[in-house]
Amino acid sequence: MTPFMTEDFLLDTEFARRLYHDYAKDQPIFDYHCHLPPQQIAEDYRFKNLYDIWLKGDHYKWRAMRTNGVAERLCTGDASDREKFDAWAATVPHTIGNPLYHWTHLELRRPFGITGKLLSPSTADEIWNECNELLAQDNFSARGIMQQMNVKMVGTTDDPIDSLEHHAEIAKDGSFTIKVLPSWRPDKAFNIEQATFNDYMAKLGEVSDTDIRRFADLQTALTKRLDHFAAHGCKVSDHALDVVMFAEANEAELDSILARRLAGETLSEHEVAQFKTAVLVFLGAEYARRGWVQQYHIGALRNNNLRQFKLLGPDVGFDSINDRPMAEELSKLLSKQNEENLLPKTILYCLNPRDNEVLGTMIGNFQGEGMPGKMQFGSGWWFNDQKDGMERQMTQLAQLGLLSRFVGMLTDSRSFLSYTRHEYFRRILCQMIGRWVEAGEAPADINLLGEMVKNICFNNARDYFAIELN
């Protein structure tokens, strides 16, 4: 019987153990996509307690707690921090088989140093007190944890209208060497069907000093904000494409669509597709000219529970996997961007694992001369960010493309404790390659495979995003 979560956790061959301990474990972290609040990094936030750093805002945990019958007041409601933590501690023993069980105990181990102890109601007091004592120390502040975890770069997720004042404050602080850069997330600028679109256009017009009436005005406003982001070191964009759409339109049609929407009219699905296509093609060309990377997160079915959406708002754990086809529209969108050779470096993520092979083959259609891995099939996302999901994504990438050119893991998280997801990914990567070697499917060449592992863990992302590190 193998003990739970030893130093060789998941490393079930000797070759995997060598790969992990000698090549993967000590690689720095290049976390190119996350949702950390830049203000907390700028002010070097001190966490009040274990709830504050671990449960607050974590919709993964809330979903598990609801499934365990926990009352909503103990998830997102007015219960005390300790009551919410106790509700989580009572849920954890029921999460065996869910990645939350592994994540929980990896996060207790690093950075808190708690090993050989499982979170449950019987250990809740001890773990709460021990972690809170550590959180009072300087090296457990927001910056302190990032430094402990050997982070070199994080890319936050930021709206085009954001001032980026906190990024500027961080950049001026020469004592803090981790790169904290904004990522451009323009969803509100192209989701023309949303009720909030007109208000957003007013805000975008205000910050860009542009009166947005025609499509060219929107392009001008977005270009000004792209320049603002570039001035703060941005090299990455991200887009939530819940449904991939494609429909072409001329400028007169786009002007009409925008004008009618600003006048409060409801658009047809075809008109929505025309507008979204035009914005994405325009933005893609801008990214290509600037050497940016674009990311498409495809296939979420959001806000399914309308009652809870009205009570609690979005992003609180009521989203799931969509099953709408995407291949043809995605192909047309990428091909349109590529017509003038202005398809930027692109990472494609799918939420439905059914679409893994769709993306794994799609990227091969648009690779770039002289640019290894220009088109990337992104790491297992959200519901696929677990052992089976990562294995599936990497196996299919290896079979359909070049795993060796993969830019690897990202946390996509709102928590400063989520850096152990990089460790989890690295262990799974080494386990997978070790099994290939054990089965005679890959050569037992530690130098060849060790270098490949180092590249996937850090070097490929560093080179792909072309961000100068401190």
UniProtKB/Swiss-Prot annotation:
<dbReference type="InterPro" id="IPR032466">
    <property type="entry name" value="Metal_Hydrolase"/>
</dbReference>
<protein>
    <recommendedName>
        <fullName>Uronate isomerase</fullName>
        <ecNumber>5.3.1.12</ecNumber>
    </recommendedName>
</protein>
<comment type="similarity">
    <text>Belongs to the metallo-dependent hydrolases superfamily. Uronate isomerase family.</text>
</comment>
<dbReference type="GO" id="GO:0019698">
    <property type="term" value="P:D-galacturonate catabolic process"/>
</dbReference>
<dbReference type="InterPro" id="IPR003766">
    <property type="entry name" value="Uronate_isomerase"/>
</dbReference>
<dbReference type="GO" id="GO:0008880">
    <property type="term" value="F:glucuronate isomerase activity"/>
</dbReference>
<keyword id="KW-0413">Isomerase</keyword>
<dbReference type="Pfam" id="PF02614">
    <property type="entry name" value="UxaC"/>
</dbReference>
<comment type="pathway">
    <text>Carbohydrate metabolism; pentose and glucuronate interconversion.</text>
</comment>
<dbReference type="GO" id="GO:0042840">
    <property type="term" value="P:D-glucuronate catabolic process"/>
</dbReference>
